[in-house]
Amino acid sequence: MTSSPAPQPAPPPVPLLFPPLRDRAWPVRRPSPGLAIDLGSARTRVWLSGRGLIADAPTVTSPGPGGTRPVRRGGIVDAEGAARLLGRLLAGHLPRSGRRPVVVLTTPVGCGGDHRAAASATLEFLRPRTVLTIDSVRAVALGTGADLDEPLLVVDVGARLTEIALLAGGAVAAAHRTALGAADLGGSTTAAALAGSVVETVTGMLREDGTPRTLDALHRGLLLSGGGARRPDVVHHLARRLRTPVQPAPAPHTAAVRGAAAALLAARRHPALAPDPDDAHR
């Protein structure tokens, strides 16, 4: 049995992804349900339209000692197990209207076709009307209401994966990831070592960038999210080594799912995702 998640900040509004079509009258129908999903290595978080955050639970196929982890280092390694997990978390939450949901799923930066195929297989049981993906780092920026008019460095320290990205004009301009996370801290992996890997990555991004964007973003400061943002030692080492302000996101562990929810709300306002009259009969 999973405990009820604590109330989380509502996702901030974001602009429409496309301009509305005003010269056509659209029939008034109930919209399809919307789901925002952050499927992490350690925890899975689900946001449902009209309800908010409905699940914040360990990413295991089943509760108890027999459960296995279907996501490792950010990658889906067991699509069937991940589907069972989501089915368990969503039980009793989705409306019985027959309308197929619109889903926004966070994905690690730089993930390839294998990850997207696994994600598609995981969500197949939902019979989604549409599946939209959003890079976790961009979701973090949306979820915190960050100003995307200026270059921004986002560092998302998850349980087993750290993603570092430069956002420019609201899009991912450069990104890297490392297979280290907050759950690795302890023993031979220290907060200083984790921060050092981030510093090395940012330094490389500075060398590779032929524009002033990365340097401008570094002067602006880092936006830090994920479970690692709740570790004062990680924040301290990053700020000291990079000599720049490090701003932990509000409720950093749910920033990505809040951003996915913000993207979902914007997408559902577009006429292309207007309610499908045939959904109720499928």
Task: Please name every model-derived segment.
Residues 151-157, 161-167:
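Basic (Lys/Arg-enriched) interaction patch that binds polyanionic ligands
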